[in-house]
């Protein structure tokens, strides 16, 4: 039991040491993205951005250009010796479709219409086979029984009756 409490305390201490002591605000003005700090901003990785006249504000560029990166603020008035980092990741989908109720209804209606047209095409194609006669024509083309089978002679004592020529049948 002591090992589990020690392990949970160790995990908690590790997680708390990674928590930022202060927040770094991200602003969106019109179509641009800005990172604000009380003191100074340091670029770590990603979009470099442009420092404005005061070094407390970093312009990351237009939202539509997907700004992303990691930035560090070097302390605030309260936390002078602390550093805090923020990760910015914008994903502007330029070729996406907004799925409002009208768009979803349009997709469903066009899907039903396309399915019905496909079913109609299959029905028309499968319903009219070319080169095949109807069922009535099949029965007329059959041969009569007399022409296909040879009649057996009167029953003999042999195990099987002998097949002979076209003898007259006894009816």
Curated annotation (Swiss-Prot):
SMART domains membership: ITAM
Keyword Lyase: no
Topological domains annotated Extracellular: 22-105
Cytoplasmic side: 127-171
Compartment(s): Cell membrane
Pfam family of the protein (one): Ig_4
PTMs per UniProt: Phosphorylated on Tyr residues after T-cell receptor triggering by LCK in association with CD4/CD8.
One GO BP annotation of this record: T cell receptor signaling pathway
Membrane-spanning ranges: 106-126
Positions of post-translational Phosphotyrosine modification: 149, 160
Function: Part of the TCR-CD3 complex present on T-lymphocyte cell surface that plays an essential role in adaptive immune response. When antigen presenting cells (APCs) activate T-cell receptor (TCR), TCR-mediated signals are transmitted across the cell membrane by the CD3 chains CD3D, CD3E, CD3G and CD3Z. All CD3 chains contain immunoreceptor tyrosine-based activation motifs (ITAMs) in their cytoplasmic domain. Upon TCR engagement, these motifs become phosphorylated by Src family protein tyrosine kinases LCK and FYN, resulting in the activation of downstream signaling pathways.
PANTHER family: T-CELL SURFACE GLYCOPROTEIN CD3 DELTA CHAIN (PTHR10570:SF5), T-CELL SURFACE GLYCOPROTEIN CD3 GAMMA CHAIN / DELTA CHAIN (PTHR10570)
Protein name as it appears in the record: T-cell surface glycoprotein CD3 delta chain
């Amino acid at each position: 039991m002591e090992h589990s409490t020690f392990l949970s305390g160790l995990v908690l201490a590790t997680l708390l040491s990674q928590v930022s002591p202060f927040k770094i605000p991200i602003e969106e003005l019109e179509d641009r993205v800005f990172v604000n700090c009380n003191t100074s901003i340091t670029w770590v990785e990603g979009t470099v951005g442009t420092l404005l006249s005061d070094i407390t504000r970093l312009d990351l560029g237009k939202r539509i250009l997907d700004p992303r990166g990691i930035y560090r603020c070097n302390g605030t008035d309260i936390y002078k010796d602390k550093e805090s980092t923020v990760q910015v990741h914008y994903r502007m989908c330029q070729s996406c479709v907004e799925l409002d109720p009208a768009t979803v209804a349009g997709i469903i209606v066009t899907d039903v219409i396309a399915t019905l047209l496909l079913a109609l095409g299959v029905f028309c194609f499968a319903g009219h086979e070319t080169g095949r006669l109807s069922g009535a024509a099949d029965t007329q083309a059959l041969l009569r029984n007399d022409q296909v089978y040879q009649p057996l002679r009167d029953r003999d004592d042999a195990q099987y009756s002998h097949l002979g020529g076209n003898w007259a049948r006894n009816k």
